[in-house]
């Protein structure tokens, strides 16, 4: 029997516990790591630090569990230095993705009605009036949909240079390897 699901990073999810879970059928984890910068993780109220995220990535890598790490570039209040720190975090931790980890690059953050980002727009420095292409804009207009997509593009270029695996038929090409689950004939360590 195989099982998997949605997870969050936690200090108790160490290599030993994850290896035990793999031994009883864990074969897929969708994990909300979201970012590698402490400031952004605090704004998201994730209750984790970049060290916690790095520890989880290392533990998942060592246990050979297949995981998909969700990543959000361009979160409200993210500045250029935060983005550079994200790139450094990915550079420092790219070795933990190997053949069993994927980075799910989420192109942009939407602000849905009645969510904390909507209710506390002033705190997140998001304009209440200005939009561009029907998407939110920061008060200083340094965070727009186009900037968020450009950041995602830069991360894609970096991922390509590190030969990260990518998931999805639209990303298959000479430059990307495709991670296939074990049930569909994928290669170990799935």
Task: Locate predicted features.
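Conserved SAM/AdoMet-binding glycine-rich loop
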Residues: 1-68, 73-75
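Short beta-alpha junction loops
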Residues: 73-76, 109-111
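A generic "cationic amphipathic patch" detector
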Residues: 18, 44, 73, 80-82, ...
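C-terminal accessory regions of radical SAM enzymes
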Residues: 81-190
